[in-house]
């Protein structure tokens, strides 16, 4: 008799068990089409999403939105994703940041990681890969009770 092995599948969005509040995500990308796609995908998974088109707009939204996680493009005008990451670390220490890029290089990934990015993903990012990283970042940040992660 052979055993059937089934992969563990995440339940879906992370919800804080104490407040029953959905995780708030701040998504930053200067490509309006991709920003809309990311927003649709994340809202479909029941996350609260604030979408902005620049790092400067993200910094302005940071105090108002009080996100649990930031997802940002690497290459943007005025301030890039690494600059945004460093500014976030100053203003909101401990806030996790996932960096996305269409033109990722090994030096970019090393710089992002050394600067404190939680994850560095290349575009086009697979939906499940993005969702997995979002869930991991939220759990590492202590947003959810990790004992309730799997059914």
PLM feature spans:
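Short hydrophobic/Thr-rich beta-strand motif most characteristic of the beta2 strand and flanking loop
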Residues: 46-53, 61
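Acidic catalytic/metal-coordinating carboxylates
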Residues: 53-57, 80-83
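Short amphipathic alpha-helix used as the core "switch/output" element in two-component signaling
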Residues: 60, 82-93, 111
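Charged docking surfaces used in two-component/phosphorelay signaling
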Residues: 36-44
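Active-site beta3 strand of CheY-like receiver
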Residues: 65-71
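The feature encodes the CheY-like receiver
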Residues: 35, 77, 105
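C-terminal output helix
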Residues: 105-107, 121, 125-135
């Amino acid at each position: 008799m052979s055993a059937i092995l089934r992969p563990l599948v995440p339940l879906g969005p992370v919800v804080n068990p104490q407040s029953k509040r959905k995780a708030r995500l701040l998504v930053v990308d200067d490509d309006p089409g991709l920003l809309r796609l990311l927003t649709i995908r994340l809202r479909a998974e029941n996350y609260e999403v604030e979408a902005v088109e620049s790092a400067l707009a993200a910094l302005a939204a940071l105090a108002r939105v009080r996100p649990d996680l930031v997802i940002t493009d690497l290459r943007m005008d005025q301030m890039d994703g690494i600059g945004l990451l460093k500014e976030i670390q100053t203003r909101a220490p401990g806030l996790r940041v996932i960096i996305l890029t269409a033109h990722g290089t090994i030096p970019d990934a090393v710089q992002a990681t050394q600067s404190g990015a939680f994850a560095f993903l290349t575009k086009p990012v697979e939906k499940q890969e993005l969702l997995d990283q979002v869930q991991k970042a939220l759990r590492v940040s202590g947003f959810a009770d990790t004992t309730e992660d799997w059914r």
